[in-house]
């Protein structure tokens, strides 16, 4: 069983390979497909935006079955996302959850520009991001994205009786991070 520290190191090393264009492209062959057909054992869970420019398996140079990925616009944490993380932690025993925000997030920009009028379910998305706007030192999208990823990680740590004991016992670490679209670097928050 891998520890949270080792999982985080593995993600950082994979991101370094991605940034330097020296990717290994692991676990992307027929043998791996056959292996994971029997079950999955991801070493980390990643909650990230649905933005097509933010594919965690590529950013971290991982392959099929390595990451348990939950994608939702604005990397928001809803009850459904919490349930998915609970499944990953309690049943798949992932030791690490990363809430990954990113530069240029359209959901954050939409929440900043929101005037109270929108059709459909977009106001639901905006309502989850608005507290991060209020808590942000600035009103620019990048500042809000950083605060928002940290806020969503905090929400996960505190909001569920299933995750809190795992975090308290250090069986699970929940961290926030930010992906820079220009440099390719994923920066883990302190």
What is the predicted function of each stretch?
Residues 99:
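Conserved functional hotspot residues or short segments at active or partner-binding sites
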Residues 1-39, 65, 75-94, 106-190:
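Divalent-metal-activated hydrolytic enzyme cores
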Residues 61-69:
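Short helix-loop-beta junction
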Residues 11, 46-47, 70, 176:
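Conserved small-residue
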Residues 6, 44, 49, 53-60, ...:
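Terminal alpha-helical anchor/extension segments at protein ends
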Residues 48-54, 73-76, 102-103:
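Short glycine-enriched loops at secondary-structure junctions
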């Amino acid at each position: 069983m891998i520890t949270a520290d080792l999982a985080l190191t593995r993600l950082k090393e994979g991101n370094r390979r991605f940034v330097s264009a020296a990717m290994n492209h692991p676990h992307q062959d027929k043998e791996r497909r056959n292996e994971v057909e029997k079950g999955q054992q991801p070493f980390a869970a990643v909650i990230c935006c649905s933005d097509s420019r933010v594919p965690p398996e590529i950013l971290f140079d991982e392959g099929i079955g390595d990451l348990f990925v939950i994608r939702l616009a604005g990397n928001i944490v809803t009850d459904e996302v919490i349930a998915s993380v609970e499944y990953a932690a309690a049943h798949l025993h992932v030791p690490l959850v990363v809430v990954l925000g990113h530069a240029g997030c359209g959901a954050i920009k939409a929440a900043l520009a929101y005037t109270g009028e929108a059709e459909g379910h977009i106001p639901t998305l905006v309502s989850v991001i608005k507290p991060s706007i209020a808590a942000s030192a600035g009103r620019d999208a990048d500042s809000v994205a950083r605060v928002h990823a940290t806020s969503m990680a905090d929400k996960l740590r505190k909001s569920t009786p299933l995750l809190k004991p795992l975090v308290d016992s250090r069986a699970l670490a929940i961290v926030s991070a930010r992906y820079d679209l220009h440099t390719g670097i994923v920066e883990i928050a302190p």
